[in-house]
From Swiss-Prot:
Family matches, as PANTHER family: ARYLAMINE N-ACETYLTRANSFERASE 1, N-HYDROXYARYLAMINE O-ACETYLTRANSFERASE
Keywords annotated in UniProt: Acetylation, Acyltransferase, Cytoplasm, Transferase
Modified sites of kind N-acetylmethionine: 1
UniProt similarity note: Belongs to the arylamine N-acetyltransferase family.
Compartments (UniProt record): Cytoplasm
Principal localisation: cytoplasm
Residues binding CoA: 103-104, 208, 214
One Pfam family hit: Acetyltransf_2
Protein name: Arylamine N-acetyltransferase 1
High-level lineage: Eukaryota, Metazoa, Chordata, Craniata, Vertebrata
Superkingdom, natural source: Eukaryota
């Protein structure tokens, strides 16, 4: 695996020897704007691999994306290889509809330490929940970013990441009540501890998310990519464009329903990916928001 191939994949051309917060943010933003958060392999009859070589081949060589375990594992490898001080952490995701955290550790997170300060770097939450900058590991501090305000809070040995969101405007009346829309302005995202993890600890979660009837990743085909203005999401045949803060404290969310024949072209032109196998688009009944 070649680190320069990774940097070419994400379009990063700046110096590699600056291990500061500015460089970390720059690398991170290049990845989230070029590597989609997606689970399309499942809906092409393939498996979501957790082996680093397989992930590198999928994302770097074949120009695909991946879900959190894949894109954050690749980011962890890239930052470590570049020379950053990194730690792999594990998260427990909060369900928006249940307001409860998962019992299993199903989310991979990267911690980066720079000049004694710790930052959470997560390229794999996608949709409008995706951070655009590293979040400093400080309890109770609002950290405003373009997508929203992020806030970490510490209780005992557990850290909780929350999001304070803007209002949203949906111009198409047909989609005002869409179940894909996040209704909460204060959203709990996930919790984690600072215990270092290894990739082997995520193998059971990687399998579970592909086979469990309660997994939204089995229930829905998902592709999400950050843009300079917002985020594009494709869930089944429903394509959305979110523009952050298009007017004061309000996001613009536009919907479009695709035909099966349009999906391949949309993946190429909007998400910059091509699939090697036939995609069976799916948007089942499990709760999932963008």
């Amino acid at each position: 695996m070649d680190i320069e191939a990774y940097y070419q994949r994400i379009g990063y051309k700046n110096p590699r020897n600056k291990l500061d917060l500015e460089s970390l943010t720059d690398i991170f933003q290049h990845q989230i704007r070029t590597v989609p958060y997606e689970n399309l392999s499942i809906h092409c009859g393939e498996s979501m691999e957790l082996d680093l070589e397989a992930i590198f081949d999928q994302i770097v060589r074949r120009n695909r994306g991946g879900w959190c375990l894949q894109v954050n594992y690749l980011l962890y490898w890239a930052l470590t290889t570049t020379g950053f001080e990194t730690t792999m952490l594990g998260g427990f995701v909060c369900g928006s509809h249940t307001d409860k955290y998962s019992t299993g550790m199903i989310h991979l997170i990267v911690q980066v330490t720079i000049n004694g300060r710790n930052y959470i770097v997560d390229a794999g939450f996608g949709r409008s929940y995706q951070m655009w900058q590293p979040v400093e590991l400080i309890s109770g501090k609002d950290q405003p970013q373009v997508p929203s305000i992020f806030r970490l809070r510490e209780e005992g040995e557990t850290w909780y990441l929350d999001q304070i969101r803007r209002q949203q405007h949906v111009p198409d009346q047909e989609f005002l009540n869409s179940e894909l829309l996040e209704r909460k302005t204060h959203r709990k995202l996930y919790c984690f501890t600072l215990q270092p993890r290894t990739i082997e600890e995520f193998e059971s979660a990687n399998t579970y998310l592909q086979i469990s009837p309660s997994s939204p990743f089995l229930d829905k085909s998902i592709c999400s990519l950050q843009t300079p203005e917002g985020v594009h999401c494709l869930v089944g045949l429903i394509l959305t464009f979110r523009t952050y803060n298009y007017k004061e404290n309000t996001d613009l969310v536009e919907f479009k329903v695709l035909t099966e024949e349009e999906v391949e072209e949309v993946l190429k032109t909007i998400f910059n990916i091509s699939l090697g196998k036939k995609l069976v688009s799916k948007n089942g009944n499990l709760f999932f928001t963008i």
